[in-house]
Curated annotation (Swiss-Prot):
Entry GO CC: DUBm complex; nucleus; SAGA complex; SLIK (SAGA-like) complex
Binding site for Zn(2+) 3: C60, C63, H77, H83
Organism: Saccharomyces cerevisiae (strain ATCC 204508 / S288c)
Protein name: Ubiquitin carboxyl-terminal hydrolase 8
EC number annotated for this UniProt entry: 3.4.19.12
Record localization: Nucleus
Gene for this chain: UBP8
PANTHER family: UBIQUITIN CARBOXYL-TERMINAL HYDROLASE, UBIQUITIN CARBOXYL-TERMINAL HYDROLASE 22
Binding site for Zn(2+) 6: C289, C292, C336, C339
Length: 471
């Protein structure tokens, strides 16, 4: 944070100074008193790419445009229009895009000075007292439901899903409109309970915490009706529930369509639901002749998460290297029509299309030949920022390359599900990163802040990464 000569130049004119300070104070008031829904959809959403970048979006001081930092959309706005001052939508600080630093001028960081420039109307206007919900609420364990609540926490703290739910895309088109009968309605109910606003009467009510669990109860009811194996007190797998929940979100979308009966799973390539537009990627499997390097067969298959072997591995990058490495197909009797030879072929997997949200499963549960199962407790080191450049197929690399150079493709860690215990007796806990970069631990109904250093020490089972930049 530094003293900005550009804002000092503006302050030389008393009228301009008054305007800047009043605008800054008004913006901070809006940021501090807006319900999360409004912040997500307005002040935290980039006006160019429409991505929600909590903590990395700036509101233009001169025209109100919101632009992100990650894709340089506010910088582009600044260069094109000449507006150089932006207010960070998360912390309310003013940033100068010419100085490339936050402004440390005392008039802009001293609340006492700013208060002098607040319009008199504020002292005469009554604003209803509201308790703002920020999503930081646990989910009560209703009998071995930790596998559900851990997945739900990672989902409802995903900015893409929050934007989708708060846009009311499903509720505006749902033909059922009942959270106890529609899975997506139940999810929307949970989001409303965790991010919506309470009035004074509701905030003081003793039933408030119970009311916040209504959506979760509805979701349990729907899930048990759809799949009875999810009911009861037996140990369940969080990864299987992740696959179940995204399938139900897709099915709800299909049912909302006017021609729902004509839509089938075969049409997923054209599906515009959040599952297939945000979470779906595709894998390219190639069979290559080791003699002449002829690529004789290539198949493209979709994926919603990647399962990685962790045995004898220490780092996530080692797991990805193993997933991507070339494999010799022994006893395959592969005949190459190009060089007219028969030999063992080479098979390799590469990512044909990367999703916006990349979900990775670390395969901790192993099925043994004697029919029993065991858990692999190996610690796998995983990064906060993951570079997926080396694991893409040639086509995906070419799509991002400039002048023949393949750029880094960076994903940011935003969620973790860890498993404590054994195969038969265990417990799931979620860790989620919210706006401002703060991590929180969700252990059923208990929520607590946790440092990033502690998060990176966890025995991860599922990792949720979101695309951040290609550079």
């Amino acid at each position: 944070m530094s003293i900005c000569p550009h804002i000092q130049q503006v302050f030389q004119n008393e009228k301009s100074k008054d305007g800047v300070l009043k605008t800054c104070n008004a913006a901070r008031y809006i940021l501090n008193h807006s319900v999360p829904k409004e912040k997500f959809l307005n002040t935290m959403k980039c006006g160019t790419c429409h991505e929600i970048n909590s903590g990395a979006t700036f509101m233009c001081l001169q025209c109100g445009f919101c632009g992100c930092w990650n894709h340089s959309h506010f910088l582009s706005h600044s260069k094109q229009i000449g507006h150089i001052f932006g207010i960070n939508s998360n912390n309310g600080l003013l940033f100068c895009f010419k100085c490339e630093d936050y402004i440390g001028n005392i008039d802009l960081i001293n609340d006492a000075i700013l208060a002098k420039y607040w319009d008199d109307v504020c002292t005469k206007t009554m604003v209803p007292s509201m308790e703002r919900r920020d999503g930081l609420s646990g989910l009560i364990n209703m009998g071995s439901t930790c596998f559900m609540s851990s997945i739900l926490q990672c989902l409802i703290h995903n900015p893409y899903f929050i934007r989708h739910s708060m846009s009311q895309i499903h509720s505006n088109n749902c033909k059922v409109r009942s959270p106890d009968k529609c899975f997506s309605c139940a999810l929307d109910k949970i989001v409303h309970e965790l991010y919506g606003a309470l009035n004074t009467k509701q905030a003081s009510s003793s039933s408030t915490s119970t009311n916040r669990q209504t959506g979760f109860i509805y979701l349990l009811t729907c899930a048990w009706k759809i799949n009875q194996n999810l009911a009861g007190y037996s140990q369940q797998d969080a990864h299987e529930f992740w696959q179940f929940i995204i399938n139900q979100i897709h099915q709800s979308y299909v049912l909302d369509l006017p021609n729902a009966k004509e839509v089938s799973r075969a049409n997923n390539k054209q599906c515009e639901c959040i599952v297939h537009t945000v979470f779906e990627g595709s894998l390219e499997s190639s069979i290559v002749c080791p003699g002449c390097q002829n690529n004789s067969k290539t198949t493209i298959d979709p994926f919603l998460d990647l399962s990685l072997d962790i045995k004898d591995k220490k780092k996530l990058y080692e797991c990805l290297d193993s997933f991507h490495k070339k494999e010799q197909l022994k006893d395959f009797n592969y005949h190459c029509g190009e060089c007219n030879s028969t030999q063992d072929a080479i098979k390799q997997l590469g990512i044909h299309k990367l999703p916006s949200v990349l979900v990775l499963q670390l395969k901790r549960f192993e099925h043994l030949l004697n029919g029993s199962n065991r858990k692999l407790d190996d610690f796998i080191e995983f990064p906060t920022y993951l570079n997926m450049k080396n694991y893409c197929s040639t086509k995906e690399k070419d799509k991002h390359s400039e002048n023949g150079k393949v750029p880094d493709i960076i994903y940011e860690l935003i969620g973790i599900v860890s498993h404590k215990g054994t195969v038969n007796e265990g417990h799931y806990i979620a860790f989620c990163k919210i706006s401002g970069g703060q991590w929180f631990k969700f252990n059923d109904s208990m929520v607590s802040s946790i440092s990033q250093e502690e998060v990176l020490k966890e025995q991860a089972y599922l990792l949720f990464y979101t695309i951040r930049q290609v550079n």
